[in-house]
Amino acid sequence: MSGVWRAVACCRGCAVIFHSPMGCVHVAETMDLGSHYRILADGRQENMECVPLVSSNIREKDSIFGGTGRLRQSISYVMETYHPECLFIATSCVAGVIGDDAESESADAEMRYGIPVICIPYAGFLGGEYSEGYYKTAETIIERFFRPCEHVPNRILLLGDQMGPEGQYVTEVKRLLSLLGLEVQGQFPGYLPFPEWANAPAAELAIVLGTTGQSDRMNGMADLLEKKFGIHAVKDIYPIGWENTCKWILEIGRLHGNVEKAKVIIEEEKKRIDSYVKSILHITKGKKAVIGIGRGTHWYNPSDTISALRQLEMRIEAVILYDNLTDKEKAEYRHRIGKEESIPVYDGRDGQELIDAADILLTTNEIVSTKTKQFFIPMVPMVGTNGEIMIFRALYRLLCRYGNKGGIAYATI
């Protein structure tokens, strides 16, 4: 259900009903709160309001007699109170177990109120994980509301979330695109107002905001847009790490027919990075670094971290694979790291002495059993030139701290 909510959370003109007990709404609220604090930590402000989210508040007796009456009342309440232009209904595990026919209620409400009322009947976790609801909602919007229209030159549609329009990922992507003379029309799903859905296919290019663990479903969404509306997509290349940022800029330049300008931009951005690295190299050069990994292979690629440390001329003493990883994940990491020349790889406790002796530990998990300075490897990666510089700055500041007292630092603006 929370995936359905995130897919339209800031789409002005929409409203969402969870056909669920009241507690289910708390999950969505917690997700929004975490995103809010991350944006505040980066010194940014949220400029978009969330759409109304209402629970039908299924009670214990409704699990016996059915909860469609509660859903009908909730629809009436939302229509009279918020006057949405489009209403989404997400069903919970409880509604799925009861067998409430939320789809029929949605169809009746659409006829009664004269607006689109769309049910995403995934029955909470019975229908799959968070991403299932998110992608199904997005695909439903594309199929029902997007309309063929003439492409507007230089207009870009961003696909994905990555902390929203005010997050570091999107702001840096917009900055790099502006250097190529490209303008972002909007971000879908989750942030494009309902009245703008029909004209979304006017974009010349769609850019997937991806990470190491990018779901095939997001790329599938890009394929759907290309098949139905002829929107070319940039996917499978993401501006994470300097090498990938260069490839990403070149690919966009190629699709936009301006490769030479893309090359000039890369040269200028490289000068920025080189200038910053030169200013901190007297602190970072020769320092001993250890990388600690406890995040699954689907969500993290150590090559970007290794590349950053090499740019700072730090000594990579070892990679430690934490005990929470499966044997399969450890084997995959050993294979990936094996491509990076001769970096030793150790299991959990076998690497404790190396961690304690290092100047800095770059880690996916906070470690309490060491006084070595720790840097938290972001779950939502820092991207582009600014992202690289932010990582470098965080490592530099951490190395400048007096003494070794443990604790962990984060990359922020």
Where are these regions (language model features)?
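An N-terminal assembly and electron-transfer interface module characteristic of large anaerobic redox
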Residues: 1-413
